[in-house]
Amino acid sequence: MRADKDLAFMLQYENIAWYNGGEVRILDRRCYPRKVEFVVCKTHQEVAQAIADMVTQSAGPYTAAAMGMALAAYECRDMTADRKLAYLEDAADVIANARPTTAQRMRLIVDGCIEAAKTAILSGADVSAAIVDHTIAMNDLRYGKVEKMAEYLVDMFPNNGGVMTQCFGETIVGQMLKIAKQRKKNIRLFCPETRPYFQGARLTATVCHDMGFDVTVITDNMPAYVMQNEQIDVFTSAADAICMDGYVVNKVGTFQIAIVAKYMGIPYFVTGAPDQGHTDVDTVTIEMRDPDFVLQAMGVKTACDGVKGYYPSFDITPPHLVSGVVTDTGIYSPYDLHRYFADGNMGEYRQSAPVV
C-alpha cells in the first residue's frame, strides 16, 4: 500500500508530479485550488524551469525533480550506456540547481535517480520506468519518515489546541492532520496567507479543510494578534534547510513569527531532518525572486508605477527561537543536531531504501 493513501488530493503522488509517456505533468500550485491545472513538461529543462517558476514548491520540487530525471532518461533512450549516463549527469545538474536555496536536497534526489539508472542500464531494464519505481519507493520511505515526525509533533499538541502554521509544509501537514485525527485531537489551525504566492491560504488551508479540520486563514501581519487573542498553543513549520548549527531556513516570514512566539511563550517546533550539507548558516544562499510579485496579489497590481518591490524567498531563524527540531526519531535540541546522525540516521531525503 502506498504511503499517500488517505492524504489530501494534492499530496497524492500523481497530483504532485508524474512521468508518463515522454512527459511530466506537474500540478500548478500557483492557481490551485481555484483551478486544478497541470503544467505539461516535454523536456527535463522544462521541468527545471517549472520548479524555478514556482509551479510546484515546498516538497513538490523533489518529486518533480525525480520525474524530470525519468523524462531525461526517455530523452536519451537511444544513446549508448556511457553517453546515457553522461546525459543524465548533465540533466541532474540542471534540475538540482533550479532553485539555489534547496540545491543540497535536490542533489540527493537526482543522485538517487542516477543510481537507479545505473542499475537499470546494467540489467537492460527500462531506465525511465526504473527511475519512476525508485521515486515511488523513495516517496513511500519519505512519507513514512514524515509520519513518524508527525507522531512526535502531535505529541506537542494539547487536545482542542490551537496550532499556527507557516507557508505549506507539504507532507508533514497531511501526516500531522492524519495522526491528530487518529488520536481524536480536535485541533484548530491558523494559517498565515504567505504572500506573495499565498501558499498558506491556498495550499495549507485547503489540505486542512479537505481532511476535515477547523482552519482559519489570517493575513501575514496578524500572527501576533492571533497568538495573543486566539489561544495558540504551538507554532510549527517545515524547513527548506536545517543547518547543523541549528539555524532554520524557511519561507520568509518564519523568523518574525518565531520572534513573536518566543515573546508570547509559545513553543516553535520545526519539522525535518538536519542537513549535513549545511554545516552552518554561512553555507546558505538566500534566493532573491522577482520583486514585481510583491507589487501584486494573484496577478492584480496593488502598487502604483514607480514603486519598488523586494522579495527574498526565505529567511533564517536562529536556534534560540527554536524549541525543538522534530525528526523521524524524536525531538532534538537545535544545539545538538549532530546527535541525530550519531544515532545512525540518514536524513529525510538521503537515499536509504533499495534502488528499485
Give the ranges of each region predicted by the language model.
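Histidine-anchored nucleotide/phosphate-binding helix
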Residues: 173-182, 258
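SAM-dependent methyltransferases
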Residues: 1-26, 122-125, 334-335, 339-356
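Conserved phosphate- and dinucleotide-binding cores of soluble alpha/beta proteins
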Residues: 194-356
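Long amphipathic alpha-helical segments
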Residues: 7-123
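Conserved phosphate/anionic-ligand binding catalytic regions in large, soluble enzymes, centered on
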Residues: 53-68, 102, 164-168, 311-326
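Ligand-binding beta-strand-loop-alpha-helix segment within the catalytic cores
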Residues: 105-159, 185-187, 191-235
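Glycine/charged-rich beta-loop-alpha catalytic/anionic-binding loops adjacent to active sites
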Residues: 30-33, 38, 42-52, 131-136, ...
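Structural signal for hydrophobic packing residues in well-ordered secondary-structure cores
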Residues: 55, 73, 77-80, 92-99, ...
